[in-house]
Every structure is written in structure tokens, then in C-alpha cells.
Regions:
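Short loop/turn segments that flank or connect secondary-structure elements
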Residues: 1-126
């Protein structure tokens, strides 16, 4: 209640507040106990024209801007995401594939295609 829906983290980035050490303030659960974003849910159900911010859609990938117009992408390892990471391993679904929609929305189809090519080359050469 005291910090509001967002705060500035240790990296100086504005981030969404967390409730009880695990849930984003916009978290809701469906009838099966699956964690959902209430903003995205309202948009998908036609109840809001507001689209979830790309920074939220990309999570656990965090974007960082560098001098010279460079954009870095970092994977934010956090224990609350452990069940999703494990499920991804079981399904053989890496984070960048799971986030295809948001990554394409942010960087474009050509960029995402190149990402997949580079990832495949790394897998083949390791």
C-alpha cells in the first residue's frame, strides 16, 4: 500500500510492485489457479483498450538501454518464476520461444527470425 503500483529498483528502473513476495499488483488467477495479468485479461475480453506494457509482456526478459542506441536484453532470474522455467524445460520451450509474441511486437519479425537462427546455430555448435 505504501509504495503504490510501482517503485524504482536497485538498477534505477521503474518496476511494478510485488504483493506477498511473488505476485505483480495486476495478478489475477483463473478458475484453475493459473496466474494471469488482469490488464491483459481485460484487454483480451474487450473490457479495456489498454494493452499491457511491453516491459510486462517481455518479463522475465528485461530491456536495458546503452549509449549509442544499443539495447540489451537480460534474463531476470527470480525464484517466483521457477515453476514456469521448469515447465519450459519439460516442454523443450526456451524463454525466447515462449516470448515470441512480445519479442516480435517489440523488435519485429525479421529480428525475431534472426534470433531463432542464432539460437539454432549455438545449439548446433555446442
Amino acid at each position: 500500500d505504501k509504495q503504490g503500483v510501482a517503485y524504482t529498483d536497485r538498477d534505477g528502473e521503474l518496476v511494478t510492485s510485488i504483493v506477498n513476495g511473488k505476485d505483480c499488483v495486476f495478478t489475477c488467477y483463473d478458475g484453475n489457479g493459473c496466474c494471469l495479468c488482469s490488464l491483459e485479461r481485460a484487454h483480451r475480453n474487450g473490457k479495456s483498450s489498454f494493452v499491457k506494457p511491453i516491459s510486462c509482456a517481455l518479463y522475465p526478459i528485461r530491456e536495458k538501454q546503452f549509449p549509442g542506441g544499443l539495447t540489451g536484453l537480460n534474463y531476470d532470474r527470480w525464484s517466483v518464476c521457477k515453476p514456469a522455467v521448469e515447465k519450459g524445460r519439460q516442454l523443450g520451450l526456451p524463454v525466447y520461444r515462449f516470448l515470441q509474441g512480445p519479442l516480435t511486437r517489440r523488435f519485429g519479425e525479421e529480428w525475431y527470425r534472426e534470433l531463432c537462427e542464432v539460437a539454432q546455430a549455438i545449439v548446433e555448435n555446442c
